[in-house]
Design a protein with these regions (language model features):
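DNA-dependent DNA polymerase catalytic subunits
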Residues: 1-250
């Protein structure tokens, strides 16, 4: 609290007046009609991790003058806030980032394992990736079902439309149209469909007998582990415990 107050005072008393006077000097130098450049302090944080430009996590104690009793995460450009990430993973990722900011590597590894177990207990609908189906008809092929280079979620949509109709369950499951909000998930191979993806609108078509082939490991890796690993690599942490020669002799 004392450090945050001190930093806030430095900004108000020293930095902001200096920046303001510098902008006024610039305005006078270029003979501006009016000085419109204004800069205010944004966040005071005790920890931060940057993965790239405009991609970062901050442990914020004060945001634009609003003081917090407990630090709040500010997440910019990271997978956790993207709607293309499955909803349960967005929650898991935010909690993982809190551990990254205030916990230990062991606590992080334990949390990842807990998330892995929880993730595998969820139904396909909750672990699948949200997308929008665009150009379904464009990518559809009468000879090979889908054209070369077809995006994976559209390929899943075409396969869904084809097999729900062929299995005569299209009365229960609506056909995926252009612009439809859909979900897709990876499948383990081999399976009877000989494909590694299936899409659906809301309910997973269990009649296709593909739910047992959902690749939970790959889904977890792409939806949760890969985004976390980007952050962990920046601070030198691992996603799992590794046996080393040093630990063998300790």
């Amino acid at each position: 609290e004392g450090i945050v107050s001190f930093l806030n005072k430095v900004c108000e008393v020293e930095l902001e007046p200096y920046i303001e006077s510098s902008y006024q000097e610039l305005a006078d130098y270029v003979n501006a009609y009016d000085q419109k450049m204004i800069m205010k302090r944004e966040n005071i944080a005790d920890r931060g991790i940057w993965t790239a430009k405009k991609r970062y996590i901050l442990n914020v104690w004060d945001s634009e003058g609003v003081r917090y009793e407990e630090a709040k995460l500010k997440i910019m450009g990271i997978e956790a806030i993207k709607t293309s990430t499955p909803a349960p993973c967005r929650t898991m990722l935010k909690d993982a980032f809190k551990i990254l900011m205030s916990g230990t590597e062991d606590e992080c590894i334990e949390y990842i394992e807990k998330c892995r177990t929880e993730f595998k207990s969820l139904p396909p609908e909750e672990v699948s990736f949200p997308r929008t189906a665009s150009n379904v008809e464009k990518w559809h092929s009468s000879s090979d079902l889908y054209g070369k280079g077809c995006p994976i979620h559209i390929r899943g949509a075409i396969l869904y439309n084809h097999w729900t109709k062929k299995k005569e369950i299209d009365h229960k499951y609506a056909t995926i149209q252009n612009g439809e909000k859909i979900k897709f998930c990876y499948l383990k191979t081999p399976n009877w469909m000989h494909e590694n993806v299936i899409s659906f609108i809301q309910d997973f078509p269990t009649e296709l007998d593909l739910d047992k082939h959902v690749d939970y490991d790959l889904q977890f890796s792409k939806a949760f582990l890969d985004p976390v690993k980007v952050i962990l690599d920046c601070i030198g942490w691992e996603t799992e415990r590794k046996n080393t020669l040093e630990s063998f002799f300790s």
